[in-house]
């Protein structure tokens, strides 16, 4: 978002460019002294018309916020690289930002699964956001590599139900348990696609002002923190009703 001083500067510059580019004056018709005089006229006008200046700045801010919002949610809706659970064709999408070392995320796991079981028309998009430690990053890379073998859900569930330190040894053991091809897994962990997916999620989290996990986005609603089953189903119903 623009600061007030930046907006003031932007307004002044916009007025100057407007006059410079208008057909009223020939191209390059201002000399240095005229430009200084013109800047002084603008400064005086701004000082004498603070309400009008505020109105213009408010409009600029509103448009900037709208553009930011639209671009962010457009970016969010492009989730082709993210894992999906629930109904892939669901009429309501729940985005969950989580970290595998987040205790609240693990507590919320059963809540989310139960909600998906009760509401069969909800699509869950899982946004890997490893922000707590290096083991969080490693776990996310393993999980997204498991997606390439169509075993993300199984591997994700294993990690979410695990209590303890997520060492690589533990992650490889889980990979074996769910039937992953270990050699392919090792290769896929190095893929640029996985790096880009996680980087995009971090950018999205920043744009959405998400600073912790778990966080949910349902419709245009951003919900920080864990939800109980009733709360989650209530948000889903609310968004569904708004969309109908």
Where in the sequence are the language-model features?
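Soluble non-cytosolic domains of exported or imported proteins
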Residues: 32-36, 47, 103-106, 133-137, ...
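N-terminal targeting signals for export/organelle localization
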Residues: 2-10, 17-73
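Structural alpha/beta surface segment adjacent to cysteine/selenocysteine redox centers
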Residues: 95, 100, 106-180, 186, ...
């Amino acid at each position: 978002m623009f600061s007030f001083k930046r907006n003031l500067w932007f307004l002044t510059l916009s007025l100057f460019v407007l006059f410079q580019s208008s057909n009223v004056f020939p191209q390059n018709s201002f000399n240095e002294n005229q430009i200084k005089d013109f800047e002084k006229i603008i400064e005086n006008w701004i000082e004498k018309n603070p309400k009008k200046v505020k109105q213009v700045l408010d409009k600029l801010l509103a448009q900037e916020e709208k553009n930011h919002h639209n671009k962010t949610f457009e970016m969010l809706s492009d989730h082709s690289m993210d894992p999906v659970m629930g109904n892939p064709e669901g009429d309501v999408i729940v985005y969950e930002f989580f970290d595998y070392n987040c205790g609240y995320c693990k507590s919320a796991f059963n809540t989310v699964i139960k909600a998906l079981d009760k509401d069969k028309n909800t699509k869950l998009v899982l946004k890997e956001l490893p922000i707590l430690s290096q083991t969080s990053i490693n776990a996310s890379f393993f999980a997204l590599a498991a997606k390439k073998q169509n075993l993300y859900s199984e591997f994700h569930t294993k990690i979410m139900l695990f209590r303890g330190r997520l060492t690589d040894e533990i992650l490889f053991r889980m990979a074996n348990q769910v039937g992953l091809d270990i050699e392919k897994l090792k290769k896929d962990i190095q893929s640029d696609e996985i790096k880009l997916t996680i980087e995009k999620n971090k950018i999205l989290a920043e744009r959405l002002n998400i600073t912790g996990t778990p966080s949910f986005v349902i419709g245009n609603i951003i919900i920080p923190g864990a939800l109980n089953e009733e709360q989650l189903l209530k948000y889903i119903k609310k968004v569904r009703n708004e969309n109908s």
